[in-house]
Regions:
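Conformationally flexible catalytic loops at phosphate/diphosphate-handling active centers
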Residues: 149-179
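Conserved thiamine diphosphate
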Residues: 106-156, 167
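Thiamine diphosphate
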Residues: 1-114, 119, 136, 155-156
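Arginine residue identity/basic-tract feature
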Residues: 63, 87, 97, 130, ...
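Context-gated lysine
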Residues: 6, 32, 63, 106, ...
Length: 179
C-alpha cells in the first residue's frame, strides 16, 4: 500500500497510526525522508481528526490517502457517510483486525463490517500483490465514479507479509494510467 501510494504521489495523507496499519505511514514517512515522494503527511490527534483532514483535503481537490484499522476505523466512522454522500474520492486502506474486545488485536473482519453501509466502494485484497494492484486501480476508480474507496486486507496475515509483489517499474507509467 505504501509503495503504491508513493508511486501515485498523493497530495495529502492525514493519518493516526494504529496496529496493524502503522507500517503504511511509517514506510511513507521513511520514503519521504529520502525524497521519494511529495505527499504532505499530516499526523492527526486521532483517527476522527485524520478522517477530517482527508475529507477537507478531498473537498479542496486533493488526491488523498489514509490507512487505519479496527478501533481507528470506528473512531472515524462518523465521517465516512458524509464523504461518500458528498461524492469526494479518496483511498482508505484498512488492515482488518478485531475491534478491541477486550484489547484483542488478532486479525479478523469485525472492523470492516462496520463500513459496509457507509457508501464507500470496498475492494478486499487477499494478498500483498492485490493490495498493491487495488491501490493503483482504486484511485482511478474513485476519481472516475466520484466515490471514496476502501482497500481492505487481513491485518497481520496480509499487512505484514514480506512477499514479493510485481510492481510497475516506472512511476510515470502509474501516473499515465491513473491520469
Amino acid at each position: 500500500a505504501s509503495y503504491a501510494a508513493k508511486q501515485i504521489n498523493y497530495h495529502v495523507m492525514g493519518y493516526y497510526p494504529i496496529t496493524p496499519s502503522t507500517e503504511i505511514a511509517e514506510y511513507l514517512d521513511l520514503m519521504k525522508s529520502e525524497g521519494e515522494h511529495d505527499i504532505v503527511m499530516i499526523p492527526a490527534d486521532g483517527e476522527h481528526g485524520a478522517a477530517g483532514i482527508c475529507y477537507g483535503a478531498s473537498t479542496g481537490g486533493g488526491r488523498v490517502f489514509n490507512a487505519t484499522s479496527a478501533n481507528g476505523l470506528l473512531f472515524s466512522l462518523e465521517q465516512l457517510p458524509v464523504q461518500s454522500g458528498t461524492r469526494f474520492p479518496m483511498v482508505l486502506n484498512i488492515a482488518c483486525r478485531t475491534v478491541s474486545g477486550p484489547l484483542s488485536i488478532k486479525g479478523d473482519h469485525s472492523d470492516i463490517m462496520y463500513a459496509l453501509n457507509t457508501g464507500w466502494i470496498i475492494l478486499f485484497a487477499k494478498d500483498p500483490q492485490r493490495v498493491y494492484d487495488y491501490n493503483i486501480c482504486g484511485i482511478k476508480i474513485a476519481e472516475k465514479v466520484k466515490l471514496p474507496i476502501i482497500i481492505a486486507f487481513d491485518g497481520f496475515f496480509t499487512s505484514h507479509q514480506k512477499r514479493r509483489a510485481q510492481i510497475i517499474a516506472d512511476d510515470k507509467d502509474v501516473h499515465d494510467f491513473i491520469g
